[in-house]
């Protein structure tokens, strides 16, 4: 254990003693609640709310509130919270991550802090890993809250904004991290206050917190719209790289020359093109220099094509189904619908496989899960495996981790690892072990790391005549059924890593599923034959329960569930999750991992040292070794990978912190505009700042006689219908020498304010305020989108600054700040220009159309329902809005991959674009001329 982890655990005993005291306190008053009627129990909720309003803290109310929930759960669900569950609930309320083993009833624990914190009336969010669990928990645990008079909502995909608003309005809301995150982003793309759905971020309880806050933290949530991208290059480069050969890196010091056209580093998952490869590519493409700025995007296409060829393996990293490349999750082995790699990687794989290449998208709004969860005033979470990541929870989220004791002692026997020289020998031993255990009837769960390996093992088992079920990416329709029955006598289940988190494997089987299967066999359906189903269910359930009870005792005597891992995962946590499937609630169980030197983890780390040990010992292929040195090497390899992944996540956070501060400014500004704040004063400041900026650019050097005032006035005329002339200023100052920058500024500012008042008198104040609101929102959104694109581009190349002995992060912060300032100047300049140059007409009713690109004279259209005056800007006809908005988010247990899909039309926010002929403001053009980089193509 590292020194840091020891320090992290130093205060553990103190916290556990405090939690024990709370649990004892709740138990001591339990009897007071038993004799209350349902109505009296329900009335306590209002009493607690009043006491909170009168100044009592939630901590003061905790013992009574917890005792109330315990009694309600007994009456509604027939389940009483154990004392250890009370401890877990208290840990969550205090803002800790509670580590509770599989089968300890984490879902029931969530009801305690949810009820207590909902008494404040500010809302509680319970966050799960998928829609199925969110709906299941909100329905089941929601019964307890509803019984106590609280409202319960559930956010799932494809809900309309009105439905979402209603769910967020509830006291307690269940949903997935992606849904909560996207609603936050969409709220910050809304065009009127009426479109907002969330009501703040008060308290969140995150179920499977390690999966959501650790595994998924490297992948941001992104809302995007279609971008212009040439897909032909993907196909061209896919063909081209088949003619390039893989080689090794050179080393000048050792006199080793590089070989082949490119090299691949599997450990870091990177590729590098050699000089020979560059020469071939330049020759085939007919270009002089691949690394010229005009050819920059081609380097990205080339790197992706090589990665697709060398690092992404079919049937391990992805499968091709119906002409579509589907990513296989490396943790769970499941296909997640719509999941795609970003940065053009998915398109490169599509080109390699010769299927249709789908378009890339442009980012409209983005946030990492790390920063989203840091928005909450109080955050807590629960999981079966958190201690290995305690340092990360503390450093990034300021969350302590508390291991909650189990209700019954854990009696699972964790056997030591067996290591074989070859993979074939390892799988032969695995099959022997399974056949032996299966013969006596012990249920077995086998964990593999890929679809390919699960199918190979399945073939070997079939040859031996062992009946088994396969649970992998190609089988996930039957997932819940297979998992539920994996604890039955003689069951053999082969699972790609452990999919199906949130479903317990009960020894002897699951009576609910058995009863349902029995009724379906009789031809009944819960939807079509509601009454018959309801009538037949109790009897079927009773029969199933008796059968399960008898089988449970048999399986228990056989040693419980045997978990067999066929490979160590790069994260100890995933291994522990697989092990944790066995030995729930004090049941017996056993686990063992079989390894070989061909396993990915061993191949990438320490394999040579282990190979040496085996060679020296002269061990035959089919004889395993149990060697402490080898076991230590594996543990060291795992901690290296974990540390590497932690550093990556910390790095993502450091860079996102820069964008996060900018996001807070922009979203704060948007919210002020949406909430109807009078922008008149702000627009006056915009005008003054823009005029000052124009004048500063033209008068920064030389004397008045040398200034190009004609050019300056030309710029003013583009901005607004300027009335004051250079001659008038010269006359007022006496001569040209008397015309100072301050004098020009004062005169032009007075003029622009007069012109603006005149325009307001023509249109009317109400119309002008509404026009200001729409213009500022429109410009703000478009400039922010362009800024995100620029920041993306900046981050991609910033690592190269290290070669110039500069800190990439410091450079990113500095340049990001400059770009943000240029964007803010651009927002002011464009807003003023639009307010003067848009032709506006008032209409009784107007169709909802978004703002779109114009040329010299942009057009502004109404978007979103609002009670403000209905106006329409006359100008060029607006092009069509993009058909859809796209989303991209981390997968459940995903590393590197993303779930992608399209929002339903009523979920999407309008795309608002307008701009000058080259799409740049003067501020941005000046920045580009200085070499600060204007708009650039993204690699």
Swiss-Prot record:
Membrane topology: Peripheral membrane protein
Biased composition (Basic residues): 924-939
Chain positions recorded as ATP binding sites: 85, 103-107, 504
Superkingdom as given in the UniProt entry: Bacteria
Gene Ontology MF terms in the entry: ATP binding; protein-exporting ATPase activity
Pfam families: P-loop_SecA (PF21090), SecA_DEAD (PF07517), SecA_PP_bind (PF01043), SecA_SW (PF07516)
Role played: Part of the Sec protein translocase complex. Interacts with the SecYEG preprotein conducting channel. Has a central role in coupling the hydrolysis of ATP to the transfer of proteins into and across the cell membrane, serving as an ATP-driven molecular motor driving the stepwise translocation of polypeptide chains across the membrane.
NCBIfam families in the record: PRK12904.1, secA
Name the record gives this protein: Protein translocase subunit SecA
Gene: secA
């Amino acid at each position: 254990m590292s020194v840091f982890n020891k320090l992290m655990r130093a205060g553990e005993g103190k916290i556990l003693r405090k939690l024990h005291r709370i649990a004892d306190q709740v138990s001591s008053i339990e009897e007071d609640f038993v004799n209350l009627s349902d109505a009296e129990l329900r009335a306590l909720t209002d009493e607690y709310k009043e006491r909170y309003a009168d100044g009592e803290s939630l901590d003061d109310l905790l013992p009574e509130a917890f005792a109330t929930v315990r009694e309600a759960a007994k009456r509604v669900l027939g389940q009483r919270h154990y004392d250890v569950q009370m401890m877990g609930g208290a840990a969550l309320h205090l803002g800790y991550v509670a580590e509770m083993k599989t089968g300890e009833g984490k879902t029931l624990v969530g009801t305690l802090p949810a009820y207590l914190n909902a008494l404040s009336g500010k809302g509680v969010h319970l966050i799960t890993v998928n829609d199925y669990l969110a709906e299941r928990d909100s329905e089941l645990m929601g019964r307890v809250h509803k019984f106590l008079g609280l409202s319960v909502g559930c956010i799932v995909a494809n809900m309309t904004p009105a439905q979402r608003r209603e769910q967020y309005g509830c006291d307690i809301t269940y949903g997935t991290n992606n849904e909560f995150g996207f609603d936050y982003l969409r709220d910050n793309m809304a065009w009127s206050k009426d479109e907002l759905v969330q009501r703040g971020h008060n308290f969140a309880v995150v179920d499977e917190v390690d999966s959501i806050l650790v595994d998924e933290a490297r992948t941001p949530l992104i809302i995007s719209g279609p971008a212009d991208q040439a897909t032909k290059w993907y196909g061209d480069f896919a063909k081209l790289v088949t003619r390039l050969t893989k080689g090794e890196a050179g080393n000048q010091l050792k006199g080793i020359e590089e070989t082949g056209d490119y090299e691949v580093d599997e450990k870091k998952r990177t590729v590098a093109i050699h000089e020979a490869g560059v020469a071939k590519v330049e020759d085939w493409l007919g270009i002089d220099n691949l690394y010229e700025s005009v050819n920059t995007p081609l380097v990205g296409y080339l790197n992706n094509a090589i990665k697709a060829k060398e690092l992404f393996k079919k049937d391990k990293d992805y499968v091709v189904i119906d002409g579509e490349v589907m990513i296989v999750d490396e943790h769970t082995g499941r296909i997640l619908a719509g999941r795609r790699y970003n940065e053009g990687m998915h398109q490169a794989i599509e080109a390699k496989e010769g299927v249709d290449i789908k378009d890339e998208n442009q980012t409209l709004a983005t946030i990492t899960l790390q920063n989203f969860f840091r928005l909450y005033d109080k955050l807590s979470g629960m999981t079966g495996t958190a201690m290995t990541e305690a340092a990360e929870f503390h450093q990034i989220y300021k969350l302590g981790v508390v291991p909650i004791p189990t209700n019954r002692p854990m009696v699972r026997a964790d056997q030591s690892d067996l290591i074989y020289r070859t993979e074939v020998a390892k799988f032969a031993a695995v099959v022997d072990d399974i056949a032996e255990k299966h013969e006596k009837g012990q249920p077995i769960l086998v964990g593999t790391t890929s679809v390919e390996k699960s199918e190979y093992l399945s073939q070997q088992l079939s040859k031996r005549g062992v009946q088994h079920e396969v649970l992998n990416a190609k089988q996930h329709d039957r997932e819940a059924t297979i998992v539920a029955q994996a604890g039955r006598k003689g069951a053999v289940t082969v699972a790609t890593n452990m999919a199906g988190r949130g479903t317990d494997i009960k020894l002897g089987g699951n009576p609910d599923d058995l009863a349902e299967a029995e009724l379906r066999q009789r031809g009944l359906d819960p939807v079509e034959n509601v009454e018959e189903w309801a009538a037949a269910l109790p009897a079927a359930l009773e029969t199933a329960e008796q059968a399960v009870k008898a089988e449970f005792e048999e399986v228990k005597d056989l040693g419980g569930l045997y978990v067999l891992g066929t490979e160590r995962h790069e994260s100890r946590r995933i291994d522990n999750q697989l092990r944790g499937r066995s030995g729930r609630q004090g049941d017996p169980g056993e686990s063992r991992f079989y390894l070989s030197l061909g396993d990915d983890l061993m191949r990438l780390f320490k394999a040579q040292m282990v190979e040496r040990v085996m060679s020296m010992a002269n061990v035959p292929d089919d004889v395993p070794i149990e060697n402490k040195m080898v076991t230590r090497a594996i543990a060291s390899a795992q901690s290296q990978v974990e540390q590497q992944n932690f550093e990556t996540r910390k790095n993502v956070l450091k860079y996102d912190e820069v964008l996060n501060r900018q996001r807070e400014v922009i979203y704060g500004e948007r919210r002020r505009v949406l909430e109807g704040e009078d922008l008149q004063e702000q627009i006056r400041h915009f005008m003054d700042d823009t005029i000052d900026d124009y004048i500063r650019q033209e008068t920064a050097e030389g004397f008045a006689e040398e200034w190009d005032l004609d050019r300056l006035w030309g710029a003013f005329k583009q901005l607004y219908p300027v009335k004051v002339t250079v001659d008038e200023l010269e006359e007022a100052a006496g001569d040209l020498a008397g015309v100072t920058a301050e004098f020009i500024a004062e005169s032009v500012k007075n003029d622009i304010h007069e012109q603006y008042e005149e325009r307001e008198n023509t249109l009317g104040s109400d119309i002008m305020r509404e026009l200001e609101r729409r213009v500022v929102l429109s410009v703000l959104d478009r400039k922010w989108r362009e800024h995100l694109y620029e920041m993306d581009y900046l981050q991609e190349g910033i690592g190269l600054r290290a070669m110039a002995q500069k800190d990439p992060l410091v450079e990113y912060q500095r340049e990001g700040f400059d770009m943000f300032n240029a964007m803010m100047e651009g927002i002011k300049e464009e807003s003023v220009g639009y307010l003067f140059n848009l032709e506006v007409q008032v209409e009784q009713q107007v169709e909802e159309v978004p703002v779109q690109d114009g040329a010299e004279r942009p057009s502004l259209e109404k978007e979103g329902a609002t009670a403000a005056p209905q106006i329409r800007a006359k100008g060029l006809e607006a092009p069509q809005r993009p058909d859809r908005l796209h989303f991209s988010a981390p997968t459940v247990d995903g590393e590197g991959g993303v779930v992608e899909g399209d929002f339903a039309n009523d979920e999407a926010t309008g795309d608002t674009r307008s701009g000058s002929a080259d799409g740049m403001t003067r501020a941005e053009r000046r920045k580009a001329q200085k070499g600060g980089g204007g708009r650039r193509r993204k690699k």
